[in-house]
């Protein structure tokens, strides 16, 4: 067989490394490994602690309904929504305090993420890529996604994100 020049082999190895890294990133994006390692509540607690460590944010976390997040689809969607929301708050909100809660009313899970930042313009609320992704995740599970601003005061209106997911899976049928 023909031998390849060393620089060609080096280039091919570099391209293969990039491809492997990309595949790992994509698979992690689909379902974060931390959810498998820690479970939903602990994964959210870990992520919140990491964000708080590297920022000025005071984040209060209250997850009394975490045991109701008992399937991969809901766990992934809710984790990603918390992750994306905290990223947006860090980048844009100029907030100091964030409250993240997960509760249940018996029929639905309700995830609420509230900050005390500067609020959000309408054009971003409608079309930001992260918000579109959150909305799509919720819709895929048969839930509701709401975002509101100006609920706290004129000076610091903040943002409230509410996600309502039915406790019964979107495609589950009730068998009597």
Named regions from a protein language model:
Residues 1-176:
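Coiled-coil dimerization/phosphotransfer module
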């Amino acid at each position: 067989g023909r031998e390849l020049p060393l620089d060609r082999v080096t280039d091919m190895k570099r391209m293969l490394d990039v491809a492997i890294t990309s595949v790992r990133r994509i698979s992690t994006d689909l379902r974060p490994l931390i959810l498998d390692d820690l479970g939903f509540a602990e994964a959210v607690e870990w992520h919140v602690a990491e964000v708080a460590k590297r920022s000025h944010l005071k984040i209060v976390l209250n997850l009394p309904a975490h045991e109701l997040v008992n399937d991969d689809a809901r766990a992934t969607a809710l984790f990603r929504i918390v992750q994306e929301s905290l990223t947006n708050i860090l980048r844009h909100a100029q907030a100091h305090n964030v409250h993240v809660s997960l509760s249940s009313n018996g029929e639905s899970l309700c995830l609420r993420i509230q900050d005390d930042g500067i609020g959000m313009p309408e054009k971003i609320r409608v079309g930001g890529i992260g918000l579109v992704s959150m909305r799509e995740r919720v819709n895929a599970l048969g839930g509701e996604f709401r975002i509101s601003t100006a609920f706290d005061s004129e000076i610091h209106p903040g943002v409230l994100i509410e996600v309502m997911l039915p406790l019964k899976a979107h495609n589950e049928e009730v068998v009597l």
